[in-house]
Design a protein with these regions (language model features):
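Cytoplasmic-entry segments and transmembrane alpha-helices of multi-pass inner-membrane transporters
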Residues: 2-11, 117-153
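Transmembrane alpha-helix signature in integral membrane proteins
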Residues: 9-12, 16-17, 21, 89-120, ...
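Hydrophobic alpha-helical transmembrane segments of membrane transport/permease proteins
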Residues: 16-66, 156, 161-173
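Hydrophobic alpha-helical transmembrane segments of polytopic membrane proteins
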Residues: 19, 106-114, 177-188, 260-298
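An internal, D/E-rich "acidic patch" concept
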Residues: 57-115
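Generic hydrophobic transmembrane alpha-helix motif, especially the helices
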Residues: 109, 133-187, 264-266, 272
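Membrane-cytosol interface at the C-terminal ends of specific transmembrane alpha-helices
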Residues: 170-210
């Protein structure tokens, strides 16, 4: 396991380096006004002097090396447009907590509703609970998320009794965004748990338990469900982390001051330093989620041996 994790972390670091470096280079192709708050009022000489002071006229390899050197020391530069001269890390630290809180609530809701739904669908395969649950999953996956997000906002705002501007101090303002964010993962958990339970139900140990006269409910809960959860658990950390950093549309829709709205604003205003800092954070979050998923699988099912699997290839 340790050997596998070492290899996985090494590959992840390489992937992180490639992704962020590529984005860094692409941002250097963008117009230079993204580095100046008062670009329209500046002369060409002032622009060139500013670019020289920021090191943006240096050769690209030199810029990349300097960026990574500073990033390893926790310095991602300063914002030039969104909040002039404010450290990128400080802005991220202000915006990330509310996205994390909303992501945690959305994940808990999707697990609390999605896992029981998948369990019931798997236990009653082909019967009305399975058909009803399948119809719900198909609806969620077939309809574009933006469509049901808008419907939830239009009809839910009046029902819950909230305004259009988000108020973090009032719990009612959290209801609609959290419900909207949880729908996709809810359908995902239910669909795959149902599939894994159906697969497990056809295995020999289940037939043996039935032959011994074990109650069908006990088989489903104590054997089939536990084994079906093992592959699903792998995706929970990455799904949660992706929810935290991927709620761009939801946060923009409800005016939530989180990471999603920050990314949209910085892209629209061409704040390149902020964008590359956000991309670095997103890449780190995604990679950490994948590694945590593998670790969680081993903790739940000790029979899994990634080290032996890697050695056998």
């Amino acid at each position: 396991m340790v050997q596998y994790l070492a290899k996985r972390i090494g590959r992840s670091v390489l992937t992180l380096f490639i992704i962020v470096t590529l984005v860094f280079c692409l941002l250097r192709l963008m117009p230079v006004e993204g580095y100046f708050a008062n670009y329209e009022k500046m002369s060409e000489a002032q622009i060139q002097a500013g670019l020289q002071a920021m090191g943006l006229l240096d050769p690209l390899p030199v810029q990349v090396g300097r960026f990574w050197k500073n990033a390893l020391h926790g310095d991602l530069g300063v914002s030039h447009i969104y909040k002039v001269n404010a450290p990128v890390t400080q802005i991220l630290a202000q915006k990330l907590p509310i996205s994390v809180q909303m992501g945690v609530l959305a994940m808990l809701l999707s697990l609390v509703l999605g896992i029981p739904l998948g369990l019931v669908m798997g236990q009653y395969k082909g019967r009305w609970p399975d058909k009803l649950g399948t119809a719900f999953i198909v609806l969620i996956q077939a309809v574009p998320a933006a469509v049901y997000f808008l419907y939830i906002q239009m009809y839910g705002t009046a029902a819950v009794g909230v305004g259009l501007l988000f108020n973090a101090a009032d719990w009612r303002y959290w209801v609609l965004p959290v419900c909207s964010m949880s729908l996709a993962n809810l359908a995902f958990y239910a669909m795959w748990l149902r599939r894994y339970m159906v697969d497990e139900s056809n295995k020999d140990y289940v037939r043996l338990a039935r032959a011994k006269g074990v109650c069908g409910r006990d088989i489903a809960l104590h054997h089939v469900f536990r084994n079906a959860m093992v592959p699903l658990v792998q995706y929970i950390p990455s799904a949660f982390l992706n929810t935290v950093v991927g709620s761009i549309y939801i946060e923009s829709l409800y005016s939530i001051p989180g990471m999603g709205g920050l990314l949209v604003t910085c892209v629209q205003r061409h704040d390149n330093t902020m964008v590359q800092g956000i991309v670095l954070l997103y890449a780190c979050v995604g990679i950490v989620g994948l590694i945590l998923g593998d670790i969680l699988m081993v903790l739940i099912d000790p029979r899994i041996n990634f080290g032996r699997k890697e050695g056998g290839r």
